[in-house]
């Protein structure tokens, strides 16, 4: 799927179209084996003890995640892991003051998903929510974004590397990461408190053969730019503002029909 965003060309990578609550779409994992496929079958039939206390909203959210997540995630992580993440997402939506302001489309694509890049998935949503919920309590949404980024800066500093992107909790444990890891970490932290967020990446600047990744977060009807773990007093301010305005290609990931 391709979308044009001013001032740069912006590509959102997604799976084929299907509605969030649509029950007739073909199941992507129906031919696969293992806990993930078994659980998806149980979601459709209601035949499992795991679903005794699941709500209709949680069921729909799980169907969306399983429909669009990478196949490796279906087989690598347990159904309980995804259910815990779904429940924490809805808890944040209920308890954070901006929860009711986030449109369903944005919640579905930029809060609910766990994956940001090619990192291993972990329990960061639950951990980050417990640590951040009181810190941003009572704040306006834009102020909360800035505060979360301050918190991220306290946890992680920049260090270049060429390895695979580390998981958010692994980044916290090491206390450092490159821009791709810092932005993955910051997106995970923002999503943990119910703020729509996405990683934005340019593979090459106009002025040099180098790349960069940063964060966009949504508040009050608009997307705002911020440098991950690089706190500023306001949004839409970063050292990369000028080169980003001249970048020819930027992309992000959006799982589902967005």
Feature annotation, model-predicted:
Residues 4-13:
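Sec-dependent N-terminal signal peptides
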Residues 16-17, 182:
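General secretory precursor processing signal
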Residues 177:
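Catalytic beta-strand/loop cores that center a nucleophilic Ser/Cys/Thr
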Residues 14-15, 43:
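Prokaryotic Sec-type signal peptides and long signal-anchor helices
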């Amino acid at each position: 799927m391709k979308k044009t965003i001013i001032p740069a060309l912006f590509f959102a990578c997604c799976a084929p179209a299907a509605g969030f609550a649509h029950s007739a779409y073909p199941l992507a994992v129906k031919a696969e084996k293992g806990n993930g496929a078994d659980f998806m079958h149980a979601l459709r039939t209601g035949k499992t003890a795991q679903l005794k206390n699941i709500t209709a909203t949680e069921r729909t959210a799980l169907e969306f995640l399983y429909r669009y997540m990478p196949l490796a995630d279906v087989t690598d992580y347990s159904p309980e892991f995804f259910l815990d993440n779904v429940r924490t997402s809805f808890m944040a939506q209920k308890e954070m003051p901006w929860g009711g302001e986030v449109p369903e489309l944005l919640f579905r694509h930029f809060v609910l998903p766990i994956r940001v890049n090619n990192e291993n998935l972990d329990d960061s949503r639950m951990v980050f929510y417990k640590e951040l919920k009181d810190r941003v309590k009572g704040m306006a949404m834009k102020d909360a974004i800035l505060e979360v980024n301050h918190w991220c800066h306290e946890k992680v500093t920049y260090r270049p590397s060429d390895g695979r992107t580390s998981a958010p909790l692994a980044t916290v444990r090491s206390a450092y990461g490159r821009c791709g890891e810092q932005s993955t970490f910051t997106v995970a932290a923002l999503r943990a408190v119910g703020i729509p967020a996405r990683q934005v990446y340019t593979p090459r600047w106009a002025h040099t053969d180098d790349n960069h990744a940063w964060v966009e977060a949504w508040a009050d009807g608009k997307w705002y730019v911020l440098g991950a773990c690089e706190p500023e007093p306001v949004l839409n301010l970063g050292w990369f503002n000028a080169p980003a305005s001249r970048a020819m290609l930027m992309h992000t990931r959006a799982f589902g029909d967005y």
